[in-house]
Amino acid sequence: MNDKEYMRLALQLAKKGCGWTSPNPMVGAVVAKEGRIIGQGWHQRYGQAHAERNALASCTEDPQGATMYVTLEPCCHYGKQPPCVDTILDAGIHRVVVGSADPNPLVAGKGIAILRAHGIDVTENVLQEECDALNKVFFHYITTKRPFVSMKYAMTMDGKIATYTGASKWITGEIARNHVQRQRHRFRGIMVGVGTILADDPLLTCRIEGGRDPVRIICDTHLRTPLQSQVVMTAKQVPTILATCCGDPEKQAAYQQAGCRVLCLEAHCGHVNLLQLMEQLGQEQIDSILLEGGGTLNWSALESGIVQQVQAYIAPKLFGGRDAKVPIEGAGVPLPDAAFRLKNSRLEQLGKDFLIESEVEYPCLPESWKKSEQ
């Protein structure tokens, strides 16, 4: 096996931590000696041992003189675990092959520098693109202190998320819906607007056996969420946050008694200030959010600049209907040049349906738009 093959194995190991390591990154490590794999491990859960330590602990023989393959630069600071560079040095590892550099300001090249200063041969950027993609959530969060937000919706090929009567179950098939449940396990939070609660009364939990429920975040400017809704009735079992501009203590108390947490935020254009909400959630180590909002909230999120990714599940169906709901509403952009452009798109077939996943590239405001607003 060559360096890339060992790193691919480390990547597969890292993915086993998906949904459990937040707000830490997913990391995998492989220890090889004289062409044999003698140890492997991954970061299994937040607060527990890191991948490098687990890989060394699993070694079937002395790792002295071996090579370690690790998807992310080893840490060099004390957190919930001791520095991984110390563990590597103590084990007598001769060479370290790294996939991604760690943008965490506490690491940021220091881990690699320490290893080299102690005479260890370090090879960088092996399968870097794949390793970077694995931890795009962590990279965003650790550098911005705000959650990585993925806007998710299911629609027909004519762009409808419901019929003109409001019916939306089900647009996509079972395979696509199961994929969504895996996303709910993967993301630390799930966010909707009060309109979704009023229309569908969703539970917003992860239905995968053994999966982790995301923190539920409801944007509810005036606290209209029914006390008998599923999210409120189960708030003592699943963490639930109501983000609101309503400062009425009596209204807030009813939700708090049910187990909800009420975040009273500033208003922006008549709605919850989403930037302020993201800053607050980031401070609470919510590093990622699956946005399952309706057209109004989705537009507000784009307009606020908080969305990093779009996941569009597309069913080969046509609903039609002038009044049928679409995934993004709001004012819209006045000119094609002002569009929110998407890049690095990926297409995946899920049964009869398709998922298009793209990164959001925010536009510069065109001069003609600026003039039209004056």
Question: At which residue positions do the language-model features occur?
Answer:
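Zn2+-dependent cytidine deaminase-like catalytic core
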Residues: V31-E130, V215, I241, C246, ...
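Enzymes that bind and transform nitrogen-containing heteroaromatic metabolites
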Residues: N2-R8, L13-G17, S22-N24, P63, ...
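Generic structural signal for helix capping and beta-alpha/helix-loop junctions
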Residues: P105-L106, D132, N298, G320
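A short, flexible N-terminal coil/short beta segment enriched in small residues
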Residues: A10-A14, P23, E34-G41, E130-T143, ...
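Helix-turn-helix
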Residues: G28
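A broad detector of short, well-ordered amphipathic alpha-helices
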Residues: R8, Q12-K15, G39, H50-R53, ...
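Proteins enriched for Cys/Gly/acidic motifs involved in redox and nucleic-acid/cofactor modification
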Residues: G19-P23, I112, V126-A154
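Short capping loops/turns at secondary-structure boundaries
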Residues: N104, A108, E124-L127, I142-R146, ...
